[in-house]
């Protein structure tokens, strides 16, 4: 029988000093012996997805205390990728994931907490907390801040839905007037919450549902809606029960590694492919799997990507649907229901509700449930009122979207395509693989061949695109932007956005060892592994080289014979200490980022730290 971790600091005469300090935080004799639950918050005024979280930690804590636990809250950092994007700030985004994971470990282990409620939302915060949860392997429930309402404005006598990416495209398009650009900017992000499309934040919050670590509705219920409050209340109550089941009943089934096992990781990836999630999710799932010692690799992702259809199309792949529309159609459970009916899911998995997948679908799938309260929850809709307040409105859709033929979520029979929304490509340009979000690729670009235009920084590529040096048919190659080479594996949303604004979104390809925002669409191929800084072939590409991309056949190739490629590799190695570094790039890199780069692995390993360099 495991004993409460917190007993280390609350029991025994030798812990008198620790108890004295606990008393100074408000604990009493009656609290020593109760489970101490860490409320891992991520409130910050820098990030719209987190600006409303200040009071939500207290909300969870009150429920923990009322349910027989002791709540202790702390905060992690949170970087806003959209604000950090397009300048040196983006170098810090991915490394912040490791800092978040480490900070959670540090706080929880230093104070011997027994369990956690993780209040996350945006791009690197959910992955960082997920990595920490699987590393620590103590009971945990995730509850995120929720998605933002989609922006809306009237253009050309039509009301259209908007998001952050629309503001970026309009701002870079010289054909758009200043007045229209400002109108879109002011309308694109109307409320608190994670950006309204199927970008990285929302993708990851959906995947925590599929992993079994969060409650139904977590990924899609709007941040502003009053119904979302119940998720926080339930999390506070339920985590105490999970802690007691483990520590008092020796029930290991409630531990995150037993919930988020190999089968659950496969289900999460199947969901990701079906909903055309952000390519960043691949990076984060691989990293989380390593923390949980789950044998889940790029090989598994490649296998699944060939089996799963594309069942849910959401911005940025279409302007028609945003997360509020996914929720109306049944949210994550609605997509999982269609995948289950297609025979694609592992059914022998459990979740923090204590339910199996079939039990969860029966209770929460809008196509199956008879529970009016569940149907009411999925009818929660937007209010269209600018606000930074959580739970501030109670608007509802007139009806649910249960049209599986032409609605937001489709059945397998009526899938957007029988090929899923993500694919892994292999070839001499990416021997360990690279990732493309096929959900955002125009059908006419699935097979593409063109000359390379090579840039050794995102900044140089942006200047070339906006300067008219990139033309239709080109393959833009941006290298030395991987985890080690950047360092920090910047997102390339600005280059892809500017290709669109210059009218090249469907006539050019972009390949990088960096990564893409969840807001990216078009023929954008990232995570090329090995990266340039690790000796990857992408470092050897020269201007004018022909690159061949064949998504249906999952291949990507530098059209160059082996002898020529070997000659280039030898020439690069001959550079000595300068080998596998940019030839002509000026970039100031801080000590903190250099420390990150010294241990970083390529994207096919999740860009985690290389434990072998630490002797572990």
UniProtKB/Swiss-Prot annotation:
Catalysis: reaction(s)? (2R)-2,3-dihydroxy-3-methylbutanoate = 3-methyl-2-oxobutanoate + H2O; (2R,3R)-2,3-dihydroxy-3-methylpentanoate = (S)-3-methyl-2-oxopentanoate + H2O
Q: Which SUPFAM superfamilies match?
A: IlvD/EDD N-terminal domain-like, LeuD/IlvD-like
- Which GO terms fall under molecular function for this chain's record? 2 iron, 2 sulfur cluster binding; dihydroxy-acid dehydratase activity; magnesium ion binding
Cellular component per GO? cytosol
The record's similarity note reads: Belongs to the IlvD/Edd family.
Recorded superkingdom: Bacteria
Q: Where does [2Fe-2S] cluster bind?
A: 122, 195
The active-site annotation reads 517 (proton acceptor)
The record's free-text note on cofactor binding: Binds 1 [2Fe-2S] cluster per subunit. This cluster acts as a Lewis acid cofactor.
Return the Gene3D superfamilies for the record.
IlvD/EDD C-terminal domain-like
Residues recorded with modification N6-carboxylysine = 124
Summarize subunit and interaction data from the UniProt record for this chain.
Homodimer.
Q: Which key words are in the record?
A: 2Fe-2S, Amino-acid biosynthesis, Branched-chain amino acid biosynthesis, Iron, Iron-sulfur, Lyase, Magnesium, Metal-binding
UniProt binding sites for Mg(2+):
81, 123-124, 491
Q: What name does this protein carry?
A: Dihydroxy-acid dehydratase
What GO terms in the biological process aspect are recorded for it?
Answer: isoleucine biosynthetic process; L-valine biosynthetic process
Database matches in InterPro entries: Dihydro-acid_dehy_C, DihydroxyA_deHydtase, DiOHA_6PGluconate_deHydtase_CS, ILV_EDD_C, ILV_EDD_N, IlvD/EDD_N
Q: Which cofactor does it need?
A: [2Fe-2S] cluster; Mg(2+)
The job of this chain, per UniProt, is described as: Functions in the biosynthesis of branched-chain amino acids. Catalyzes the dehydration of (2R,3R)-2,3-dihydroxy-3-methylpentanoate (2,3-dihydroxy-3-methylvalerate) into 2-oxo-3-methylpentanoate (2-oxo-3-methylvalerate) and of (2R)-2,3-dihydroxy-3-methylbutanoate (2,3-dihydroxyisovalerate) into 2-oxo-3-methylbutanoate (2-oxoisovalerate), the penultimate precursor to L-isoleucine and L-valine, respectively.
> What pathway, per the record?
Amino-acid biosynthesis; L-isoleucine biosynthesis; L-isoleucine from 2-oxobutanoate: step 3/4; Amino-acid biosynthesis; L-valine biosynthesis; L-valine from pyruvate: step 3/4
Q: What class of enzyme is it?
A: lyase
The UniProt record lists the EC number as 4.2.1.9
């Amino acid at each position: 029988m495991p004993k409460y971790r917190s007993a280390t600091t609350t029991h025994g005469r030798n812990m008198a000093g620790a108890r004295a300090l606990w008393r100074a935080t408000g604990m009493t004799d009656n609290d020593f012996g109760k489970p101490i639950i860490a409320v891992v918050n991520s409130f910050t005024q820098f990030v719209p997805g987190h600006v409303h979280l200040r009071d939500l930690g207290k909300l969870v804590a009150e429920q923990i205390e009322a349910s027989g636990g002791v709540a202790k809250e702390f905060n992690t950092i949170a970087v806003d990728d959209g604000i950090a994007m397009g300048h040196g700030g983006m170098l810090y985004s991915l490394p912040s994931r490791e800092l978040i994971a480490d900070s959670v470990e540090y706080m929880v282990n230093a104070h011997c907490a027994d369990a956690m409620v993780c209040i996350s939302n945006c791009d690197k915060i959910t992955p960082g907390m997920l990595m920490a949860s699987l590393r620590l392997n103590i009971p945990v429930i995730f509850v995120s801040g929720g998605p933002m309402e989609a922006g809306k404005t009237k253009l050309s006598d039509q009301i259209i839905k908007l998001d952050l990416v629309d503001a970026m495209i309009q701002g870079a398009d010289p054909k758009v007037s200043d007045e229209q650009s400002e109108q879109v900017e002011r309308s694109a992000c109307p409320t608190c919450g994670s950006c309204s499309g199927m970008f990285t934040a929302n993708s990851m919050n959906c995947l925590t549902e599929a992993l079994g670590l969060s409650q139904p509705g977590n990924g899609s219920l709007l941040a502003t809606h009053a119904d979302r409050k119940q998720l926080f209340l339930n999390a506070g109550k339920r985590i105490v029960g999970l802690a007691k089941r483990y520590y008092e009943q020796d029930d290991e089934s409630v531990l995150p590694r037993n919930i988020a096992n190999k089968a659950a990781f496969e289900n999460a990836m199947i969901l990701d492919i079906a909903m055309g999630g952000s390519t960043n999710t691949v990076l984060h799932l691989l990293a989380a799997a390593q923390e949980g010692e789950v044998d889940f690799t790029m090989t598994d992702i490649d296998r699944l990507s060939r089996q799963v259809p594309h069942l849910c199309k959401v911005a940025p792949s279409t302007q028609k649907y945003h997360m509020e529309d996914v929720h109306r159609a049944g949210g994550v459970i609605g997509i999982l229901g269609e995948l289950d009916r297609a025979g694609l899911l592992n059914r022998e998995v459990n979740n923090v509700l204590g339910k199996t997948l079939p039990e969860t679908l029966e209770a929460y799938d809008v196509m199956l449930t008879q529970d009016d309260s569940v149907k009411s929850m999925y009818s929660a809709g937007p209010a269209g009122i600018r606000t930074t307040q959580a739970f501030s409105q109670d608007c509802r859709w007139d009806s649910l979207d249960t049209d599986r033929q032409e609605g937001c979520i489709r059945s397998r029979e009526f899938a957007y395509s029988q090929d899923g929304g993500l694919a892994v490509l292999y070839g001499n340009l990416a021997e360990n693989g690279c990732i493309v979000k096929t959900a955002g690729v125009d059908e006419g670009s699935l097979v593409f061949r063109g000359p390379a235009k090579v840039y050794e920084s995102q900044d140089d590529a942006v200047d070339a695109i906006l300067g008219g040096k990139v033309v239709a048919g080109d393959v833009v190659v941006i290298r030395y932007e991987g985890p080690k080479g950047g360092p920090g594996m910047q997102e390339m949303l600005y280059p892809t956005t500017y290709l669109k604004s210059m009218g090249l979104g469907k006539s050019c390809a972009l390949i990088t060892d960096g990564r893409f925002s969840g807001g990216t669409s078009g023929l954008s191929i990232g995570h090329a592994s090995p990266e340039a800084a690790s000796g990857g072939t992408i470092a050897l590409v020269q201007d004018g080289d022909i690159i061949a991309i064949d998504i249906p056949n999952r291949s990507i190739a530098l059209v160059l014979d082996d002898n020529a490629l070997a000659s280039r590799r030898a020439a690069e190695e001959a550079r000595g200490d300068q080998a596998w570094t940019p030839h002509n790039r000026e970039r100031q890199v801080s000590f903190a980022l250099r420390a990150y780069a010294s241990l970083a692995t390529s994207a096919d390993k999740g860009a985690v730290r290389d434990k072998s360099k630490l002797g572990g």
